[in-house]
Amino acid sequence: MRLILFLFALCPALFAASQPNFLLVMADDMGFSDLGCYGSEIETPHLDKLAAGGLRFSQFYNTAKCHSSRVSLLSGRWSRQAGDESLQRAVILPEVLAPAGYFTAMTGKWHLRKQPTDFGFQRYFGHLSGATNYFAGDQTFRLNGQPFAVPETGFYTTIANVDHALKFIAEARAAKKPWFHYIAFNAPHAPLQPLEQDFKKYQGRYDIGWDAIRAARVAKQKQIGLLPADSAESPRPDHIPAWTKLSAGQRSDESRLMSAYAGLIDRIDQEMGRLIAELEKAGDLDNTVILFVSDNGACPFHRGGATPNTEPYHATTRWGDSTGWAWARNSPFRFYKQNQFEGGISTPAILHWPAGLKQKPGSVVSSPAHLVDVLPTFAELAGAKVPTSYPDRQPSPLAGVSLAPIIAGGQMEARPPIHLLFSTDRGLRDGEWKLVSFQSGPWELYHMPTDRAELHDVAAQHPDIVQRMAKRWHDMTANVLTTQGKEAQPVATAATAKLNPGWSHYDDTVPTQTKSKANGKKKPAQAASALPRARKDTQLSVSGPQLILHSTGTDPGLAFERLAIETPGPYTLEFRLQSKSSGPAELYWTTDPETILPKGKHLDFEVKHDGEWHEMKLRMDEAKTLHALRLDPCGGEGEVKIEGLMLKAPDGKVLAKWP
């Protein structure tokens, strides 16, 4: 096998007839246990069949975040090392495979700079945005570099992605070329908009709640050999109540929410089945390497839940995520998307290749692997060379290693440490050990062969290992990722609560318009004075009367969603601000529950980034009642402190204040 791969590398053109096709598929916000072959009750027979005839990875890692996982997947490098969304320090998969004779195409979510056709994809259909309406799309849809008008009726993104994939693959087949096709489904990312039949298929199945579903998933994971029979699962965290503690109305709405998730995942499987059937019919399936992965674990951020007066299968309905169900979907692990604990970074990975796989079909691979390994693996199997230089870019060295030895029936050699970083969540996987920090909190150390659920922090017992791994993390951060600022600073020494203001607040929150069956009274989705959600590039902490924002990028801010405001405007937002950041400041708002900011109304305002305190009064000339706010106090990296933040009515009455 190694000799063949060596010959491929010497002269790829001579072996064109033997080169495999590549079908790379990425789901969005899929939890570790969301597929049947990973423990789920959701019906995914086609993906389960791929797993039965191929490999499942039990320790396949991502970056815990949408865009950075896509960078690592396509580039074979850590996201910061590759230049993040710009890809300025990388050469990506289609640019590697096309010179080896491959027809390259993509369908689905891009979420990076420019367009796929600017980075070697010869064909592209999909949306450039990070999320889209499943039925109506958005203005970023493109077809081969040109704007694509989404049809007003009969359109659904998951289906459209496979429709165009089949067209592009047929085009490659007609040209008698091996092909590389990348499908990036936006499912099951919010807004949760399943097709009607897919939603109704699961209605009522989740009335038993997240405690029972998680227990059943963990039991199945052990039964199918994904987890050792004696492995422990993480307990339900304090920030999630027992299912029985929810009101009857909450239980009803949360059950419907999970039915929407299940419908989205079921549809991915149905469309994968349609695609696989066409490959088999054309005689392509045996020599096609299919790799199915996810960009991060299940999402915990509550952005509007199910409501009793709406159904999710309409373009005008936008249900959001649930922390309780994210916990269940990431079984048996802790935490979620954006965190570097296993719940955020360990997700399903299925590899299927009948013509080349030498492992026993149905095997579970326990060797740690990462999205950065995909490019070197595909390049080796294709006999393609990875360029060390490229016009107008400065490619950095690859971070990943080839998984070809595993495919060939062998074992992985010792790999370099897996570097983990998103914002101030960080970690390092090095052999049997994992070092991890929650939002710059103290380093925690876990022995992964005996503690995958990260229940027993042994940092105090092994200070030498912590010191060695922490030094390695900082060395990689500075010298490989060239990361500076707060993300690269030493971690704290005092422990803090592991909480995020964007997670569901079940103690004071029920989904919009939910009526408790106990008393029939309407309750708001969110108390107006609940903590705002930290947006992208933002870490939020509270110190006494102050909201402290740590901006790590160019689009920071705070989101105030589903406000329980009944008094009509105009409104005034008052606060004191001290900024050590830079860039423009903006305020967005909407009175429409269906409008997702930054769509809506907008106000630019001036901030002096001089480290001094300044009084701010922002007027919103709005006669209707306010539904949501977004406050962006800066546009660059640095710290911003806000205190005395309050929303006032026309008569000066305080309608809400934060914290």
Features from the language model and the residues they span:
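Bacterial N-terminal signal peptides
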Residues: 4-13
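Formylglycine-dependent sulfatase
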Residues: 16-439, 443, 448-471, 485, ...
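Glycan-recognition and processing domains
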Residues: 497-565, 593-600, 652-659
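Extracellular ligand-binding interfaces
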Residues: 547-625, 636-638, 647
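Extracellular beta-strand-rich recognition modules
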Residues: 627-633
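Exposed low-complexity, polar/acidic, P/S/T/G-rich flexible segments that act as propeptides
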Residues: 637-656
